[in-house]
Amino acid sequence: MNLQELHTKIQLQIDIKIEVNTMDSIFKQLFQYGYHDTEITSIDCEGLEVKLNFDKGIYLLDENGNETILSKPMQVILKISSYSDSFEESFEIKEYGKKIKYLEYITLKKYLQKESFGISMCYYSNFDSCILFDGGFSKRNIMFSIDGVNEIIIQEL
């Protein structure tokens, strides 16, 4: 490999890494899969990283964007912008019904230890790079959002 080929290869690797961190690519990465009627079975957070586990999988999409079959168990890793001191600053969790009640992350984690979070809808906003999951547990309607997402990794468990 000559110097020019090596330079081109390195530049391509740099371009790919930059593309991974754009808001548009977060949207594309997130919505390569379908989340409606899937379940978050556990959540783990450390530092500026949020890991959502889908033990029953997430939906694979066909060429028209329609949900087809469930994947193998998957993990969605969300990396949060460094302007937050911790992942908790990027979370907003609301239980809603007749009234709206704000919840702490630890409460959501406790609920997940008892049962899975069923997802009705998943939204993404370019404003502050925010992902919102709407759904809940058997007797609780919950929306939780994570803002400042600057990278997403979706992988098999």
Residue spans for each PLM region:
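Surface-exposed, interaction-prone regions used to assemble/regulate multi-protein complexes
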Residues: 2-157
